[in-house]
Amino acid sequence: MKAKLTVSDSKKLFHEEFPYVIPGLYKRIVDEILVELNLLNHQNEFKQDYLFCIGLTETFKELTKGYKPEKHLDLLFESLCISTNFEAKEIKEISKISQKEFSDKSSKDILKLLKEKSNSKLYPSRILNLGIYILISNSQDFKENNDIEKNKMISDIFEKLSLSRNKAEKDIGIYKSSISKMEQAKELIQEQRIKDKKKTL
């Protein structure tokens, strides 16, 4: 069994594995993921299930969009996993296989499959909640609904899985807000670059 690492240990190991400067826009995101993975690794009841794998790979992918150089992203993900006692390759494989299993399904079919695959009680975490949200948001009927109907659909599914609806709504809200803020920040940076370029002409 691997030794439990402190957050400080994980950060030190991460920087040994990833010896590059992380662009300022992404530093907070990377730090938050590292701390969260470290804390989950200390929870005795936590299990690395397929929902956790989907949540981790897909939120990482979404929140690091536009990261330069792009070729560093695989190493960045691997370094986050290594420094918190997780296996990056295994997580990616489980995520890919599981998402394929849930693709092209209605929200009702997704809920049915979620219940079938959840043999034991799901360990609640932000990453797991986001994994479920990502599966639901990719369902055939989800995109056809308005925001009120979407929120109700999400709440109903979390309740039927015996997970906190309020916690899920909060986690999803923060996640969507983070994506929005990242997009706004990237637009401002791009606008500034254009202005700076015009000044040099």
From Swiss-Prot:
GO biological process terms, semicolon-separated: photosystem II assembly
Domain of life (superkingdom): Bacteria
InterPro entries, alphabetized: Thf1
Pfam families, A to Z: ThylakoidFormat
Keywords (A to Z) from UniProt: Coiled coil
This protein's record includes keyword Coiled coil: yes
GO annotation, cellular component aspect: plasma membrane-derived thylakoid photosystem II
Residue runs in coiled coils: 174-201
Annotated NCBIfam families: PS_II_psb29
Role: May be involved in photosynthetic membrane biogenesis.
Family: Belongs to the THF1 family.
Protein name as catalogued: Protein Thf1
Gene field: thf1
